[in-house]
Amino acid sequence: DNVYYCGYHSKKSFGAASYFIQRPDGNVLVDSPRFTPPLVKRLEAMGGVRYLYLTHRDDVADHEKFHKRFGCDRILHTQDITANTQSVEIQPTGTEPLELAADLRIIPQPGHSAGHTVLLYRGKYLFTGDHLAWSARLNQLYAFRNFCWDSWPRQIESMKALAHYTDSYRFEWVLPGHGRRFQSAPEAMGQQMHQCIQWMDSVR
């Protein structure tokens, strides 16, 4: 489905992973990698960048450089806008999902930060930023309790809402900024989401 891991992590984004979605209606760069010539040339060869989607305020890195190079529209929830991102072109508000396109849905998931969102692509790939990842130690999906900057109870409520998307959209991939990626059948993903919520409740 033309989903790629970018590499070229940036210290400005605390080493977070970023991803690239190649699609006929415009490519999407998910969170900002380091702006470096080999990557930029590769992105150009693959059709450039239409949207630079930023999951939250921590992982914006070289967003301005990518915007200037590709003329892409940047996307960041208004609750996570800072002095460094005031010029972002698209600033979703509120807590309702936003249909960016027929195959792209932005889902607000406050908790890690006040304006954290996740991106669902084709109902199959969920780009989760710092909201949700696979833990090899726990052998399950989890959230980052020690790196929750807004509200842990709020993040739990967000995760419960996200679990409903597992039932509705049956996504199969969790692609985080930190932590391990995870893939499973939709039924197992639903079980994992509920197990994650139980764990989050246990470490309040």
Per-range role (PLM):
Residues 1-25, 204:
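Zn-dependent metallo-beta-lactamase
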Residues 2-6, 101-107:
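Short, hydrophobic/aromatic-rich segments at coil-to-beta transitions
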Residues 6, 30, 92-93, 109:
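Hydrophobic residues at beta-strand termini and immediately following loops
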Residues 13, 21-24, 44-48, 120, ...:
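Flexible, charged surface loops at secondary-structure boundaries
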Residues 15, 34-102, 188, 192-199:
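Active-site HxH/HxHxD metal-binding segment of metal-dependent hydrolases
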Residues 17-19, 96, 117:
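Residue-level detector of beta-strand structural context in well-folded domains
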Residues 20, 29, 53:
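Short, conserved beta-strand segments within well-ordered enzyme catalytic domains
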Residues 27-29, 35-36, 72, 82, ...:
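Metallo-beta-lactamase
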